[in-house]
């Protein structure tokens, strides 16, 4: 059972062709689609075992998204930027409860080496978990033990993605500016998605935590915003479903997923399945400006 703060809804346009600055996700649908996509991609992947671990994890996320107790959303002002970035200790108890449920459900499904890591994580103090969760949400991934990050982020993702749709309904989208980080929770995107609704060819960035999407103009760097020196890369041809857009100014890059051509794609799963593209760009001196919830890579210094 969940409760929302009593904040007036912001009227929106009824036009089906109106560009939506923010799009809310259905967490259950996202997790179910992601699990199915991971199963499909694992068949031809050298990372099949890891894909299967992620599939089981995401399947539990879907179950928790449907059944868990999320408490009550903290009150916030509708003019506040990134409202879900402000959640504090009250939220910690809920996502940490989700973490314990997630680990308990996953524990019988993994081998002993992973089970040892999970049992150790289950023994951590609430204060330590709060600190690690805060570091991850702020993008300081290297401050958290690498073997714990996947599970902590998964639990936080279930909590933040539950509240994001209700928060978006209460945000004044007219005030949402083009930005590199999620306007709802302040976290990094996973990748860009190119969609066919409400109009073909629009680009949205997909949040790595709350699963929301926000509009970002194409051919602009999603990190520094410049639009002069951008390059598109792909492994096979110019019509590839996964491409990379790199910036010669800041040397950052983000992947673009053309879901308008392949609706079964999932940003996290397909990003994981195309790590060879990342290797190519890293070798050329570019660095990802995104974060994959299924692969919490430590930031470079």
Curated annotation (Swiss-Prot):
<dbReference type="InterPro" id="IPR056796">
    <property type="entry name" value="FdhE_C"/>
</dbReference>
<dbReference type="GO" id="GO:0005829">
    <property type="term" value="C:cytosol"/>
</dbReference>
<dbReference type="Pfam" id="PF24860">
    <property type="entry name" value="FdhE_C"/>
</dbReference>
<dbReference type="Pfam" id="PF24859">
    <property type="entry name" value="FdhE_central"/>
</dbReference>
<dbReference type="InterPro" id="IPR056797">
    <property type="entry name" value="FdhE_central"/>
</dbReference>
<comment type="function">
    <text>Necessary for formate dehydrogenase activity.</text>
</comment>
<dbReference type="InterPro" id="IPR024064">
    <property type="entry name" value="FdhE-like_sf"/>
</dbReference>
<dbReference type="InterPro" id="IPR006452">
    <property type="entry name" value="Formate_DH_accessory"/>
</dbReference>
<dbReference type="GO" id="GO:0051604">
    <property type="term" value="P:protein maturation"/>
</dbReference>
<dbReference type="Pfam" id="PF04216">
    <property type="entry name" value="FdhE_N"/>
</dbReference>
<keyword id="KW-0963">Cytoplasm</keyword>
<comment type="similarity">
    <text>Belongs to the FdhE family.</text>
</comment>
<protein>
    <recommendedName>
        <fullName>Protein FdhE homolog</fullName>
    </recommendedName>
</protein>
<dbReference type="InterPro" id="IPR056774">
    <property type="entry name" value="FdhE_N"/>
</dbReference>
<dbReference type="GO" id="GO:0008199">
    <property type="term" value="F:ferric iron binding"/>
</dbReference>
């Amino acid at each position: 059972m969940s409760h929302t703060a009593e904040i007036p809804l912001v009227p929106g346009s009824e036009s089906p062709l109106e560009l939506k600055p923010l799009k809310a996700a259905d967490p259950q649908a996202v997790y179910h689609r992601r699990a199915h996509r991971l199963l499909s991609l694992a068949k031809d992947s050298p990372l099949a075992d890891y894909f299967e671990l992620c599939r089981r994890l995401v399947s539990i996320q879907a179950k928790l998204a449907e059944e868990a107790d999320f408490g009550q959303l903290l009150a916030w002002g509708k003019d506040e930027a990134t409202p879900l970035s402000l959640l504090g200790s009250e939220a910690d108890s809920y996502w940490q409860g989700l973490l314990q449920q997630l680990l308990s459900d996953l524990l019988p499904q993994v081998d002993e080496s992973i089970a040892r890591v999970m049992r150790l994580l289950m023994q951590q103090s609430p204060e330590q978990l709060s600190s690690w969760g805060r570091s991850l949400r702020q993008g300081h991934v290297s401050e958290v033990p690498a073997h714990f990050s996947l599970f902590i982020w998964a639990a936080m993702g279930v909590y933040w993605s539950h509240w994001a749709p209700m928060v978006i309904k209460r945000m004044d989208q007219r005030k949402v500016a083009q930005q590199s980080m999620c306007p709802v929770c302040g976290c990094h995107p996973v990748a860009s998605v190119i969609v066919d609704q409400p109009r073909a060819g629009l680009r949205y960035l997909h949040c790595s935590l709350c699963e929301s999407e926000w509009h970002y103009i194409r051919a602009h760097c999603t990190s520094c915003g410049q639009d002069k020196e951008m390059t598109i890369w792909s492994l096979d041809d110019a019509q590839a479903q996964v491409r990379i857009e790199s910036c010669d100014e800041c040397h950052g890059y983000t992947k673009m997923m053309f879901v308008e051509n392949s609706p079964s794609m999932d940003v996290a799963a397909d990003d994981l399945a195309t790590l060879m593209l990342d290797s190519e760009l890293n070798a050329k001196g570019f660095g990802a400006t995104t974060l994959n919830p299924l692969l919490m890579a430590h930031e470079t210094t």
